A protein has these predicted regions:
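Nucleotide-cofactor and metal-assisted catalytic machinery
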Residues: 100
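Conserved dinucleotide-binding and phosphotransfer motif residues
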Residues: 103
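Short, well-ordered alpha-helical
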Residues: 1-89, 93-94, 113-118
């Protein structure tokens, strides 16, 4: 992994300077997500169709991230790691996720947790 050990600030500088693209970061994040999934079953969902975003001055712009599965993410399976919600796909975004998305961050996976995060 070439970029995943760098800080958000370091990644943002590389993005701003054109030394790396958001697409490259997404691809590396997805590759790592699949490797971790095979070994640890750490994700409810891996978003292989995550899209590159335009880079802005916001430090989160173009940065891939994972979100706990108890956050509602519009159009993406959000189970709370519970069989009760095993097919739940929300029609809205949780405020915290919406703020990350509006800042230009790119969700690449939903992480497993104890049922309902309890």
């Amino acid at each position: 992994m070439k970029y995943m050990n760098l800080s958000i600030e370091e990644l943002h500088e590389l993005l701003k300077n054109g030394e790396v693209t958001s697409k490259e970061l997404i691809e590396e994040s997805l590759k790592l997500s699949h490797e971790v999934q095979e070994k640890y079953n750490a994700f409810v969902t891996i978003l292989d169709d995550a899209k590159e975003m335009p880079i802005t001055d916001n430090v989160l712009s173009g940065i891939p991230f994972g979100v706990k599965d108890n956050y509602s993410t519009k159009g993406v399976l959000s189970t709370g790691s519970s069989n009760t919600l095993k097919n739940y796909v929300p029609f809205f975004d949780a405020t915290a996720y919406e703020k990350l998305k509006n800042a230009g961050a790119i969700m690449v996976n939903k992480t497993v947790m104890d049922e309902f995060g309890m």
